[in-house]
Amino acid sequence: MERAAERLARQRARGLWRSRFACCVAAEPSGSRLGQSVRGAAAAPARCAAEGSADLYLAVNNEGPEVAPPARTGPPDADGIEGGAAVAGNEQGGVAAGNERRAATGDEKESASGGENESESESESESESESGADDGDWDDDDDAGPAGGVTREEAEGAARALNFRIIRRLTPGSEGRVFEATGPAPAQEHVVLKIGASASTLAEAMLLRTLDHANVVKLKAVLFHGELVCAVLARYREDLHTHLWKIDRPMALPTALQVTRAVLQGLAYLHSRRIAHRDVKTENVFLNGPGDVCLGDFGAAHGPVTEPRYYGLAGTLETNSPELLARARYDCRTDVWSAGVVAYEMLAYPRALFDSPAGPQGEDAEASGPPTILGDRDCARQLLRVIRRLAVHAEEFPPSPTDRLTRNFKRHAATGREPHSPYRCLAVLRLPCDADRLLHQMLTFDFRARPTAAELLEHPVFGAASG
């Protein structure tokens, strides 16, 4: 706790708005057919945001992509949660420079992308110039180079050519550039632009075109400028991580349950369509208010997920499920675990349930320099942290001796806790019985015993919260 408080104080002293947890995994699938499909539409390089993106793209776009779909109205502003804009759908599935929450990846080729800087106030942003707004703490020298095959100047030129006025630059990722902008006259609507020469940018946009749910970010349009893909997304007041940073305290239980239910509703919708998000975290939960919540950033999404098997490594180290960290078989319930970590963070802020593995200079080392892609050993260290933090009993591991999670990690099981008993580390939250039970169910170690998102929505705690 003392180290976490000191780290938070240092971040605030430096004026950092960048998320601690914006890094995630991206692995390029072998034998991907995505590049060929996308080159025909936009002549973009064949790179995938996360392993499995090619299958997902082809599954939902068998007849090829359509461009510039009709604009869809984003959610209205709502009272209750204040703040600046948030990127609804910034690329994850990669590594953002300079952040503390780090990524894991395996032997596959990495295709890194990054999260956004947290937004500043609207009054500050509107005073910025068209060609380049304040970058916050982002280094202009680092920002000038290519990201996702496109330089800052190229991306800004494309935005202007498409009649968008840039308000603010957000942290670029290796899949492309991200901006807050106003759209063409007469509406001049505030939106978020994702501009890149990456096939995964188009694949994510084409996936979002097929989704229509109140708790899933809305795509407004997909535009092209030469070889560049421009996804136009809804703009939200803030993301959940920023909101927690600003209030600097745990959320009230009713509000946390309201947000948790919205996240589970979005996941239940995705899972009914056999899509796993694979990167649920506070940075990817966007809010206009506690009753207006959506999931964004589908750069790591995979589908169709039809049965438990290994679909590749993706996501964020601290929020990844045990089965994904072990590179074992998994299904859509991997998202339920991640949603449980998000729920804990809302209720325990600024405490984190699972800190990232210690870096070369120790846990307190400030993140600096270029991003780091983490490998199997980092995933293993993180999984050991999960096992030790929850004191997972041997009987709570998957029963099959051939399961990678059981085969490689059961020997590290704890002995000081009864199997299937409450996690001691959750007792400090002092939750009511129903809420405590919900959190324990979401954090069930063996995903085969973990409820689905749809099943959790029937939990009595949500009836009590809405009553």
UniProtKB/Swiss-Prot annotation:
GO terms for biological process: symbiont-mediated perturbation of host apoptosis; symbiont-mediated perturbation of host chromatin organization. Residues 117-144 have a biased composition (Acidic residues). This is Serine/threonine-protein kinase US3 homolog. It comes from the Viruses. Belongs to the protein kinase superfamily. Ser/Thr protein kinase family. It is found in: Host cytoplasm; Host nucleus. It catalyses: L-seryl-[protein] + ATP = O-phospho-L-seryl-[protein] + ADP + H(+); L-threonyl-[protein] + ATP = O-phospho-L-threonyl-[protein] + ADP + H(+). The active site is at 279 (proton acceptor). Its EC number is 2.7.11.1.
